[in-house]
Amino acid sequence: MAKSMNFSPRTIEASELLGTQIRIGRLERRWTVEELAERVGVSVVTLRKIERGDPSVGLGVAFEAATLTGVPLFYEERARLLAELRHARDRLAVLPSRARKAGEVDDAF
């Protein structure tokens, strides 16, 4: 049995916004739920979860539905998205490869 997640209100609201935008894009293109589900490569049930804003749906699947329906992800221009991705990768490269718990500070002297 899958573990139940407790999502923060902001996550729930953002998921609902993305799902609503995807539904608007689908309706503007006059695609049925079945048509978009086929284009995304998921079941109708999964697509309905996306449109309802279910935060448990896979991120890549939701992003693909958004891309196909014209919902902008981060930046309209692909060049800007790629530039931001390069910047994020550069920042990540200078950080430690993993986080370690900070040791206790002994300040009793």
Language model regions located:
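Short basic helix-loop element that most often maps to the first helix and adjoining turn
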Residues: T20-E35, E64, V94-R100
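DNA major-groove recognition helix of helix-turn-helix/homeodomain DNA-binding modules
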Residues: G58-E76
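Short, charged recognition helix plus adjacent turn
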Residues: E76-F109
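A short, Lys/Arg-rich alpha-helix, primarily the initiator
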Residues: A2-E28
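Short alpha-helical DNA-recognition segment
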Residues: R30-R48
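Short amphipathic alpha-helix starts
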Residues: S15, V40, F74-E76
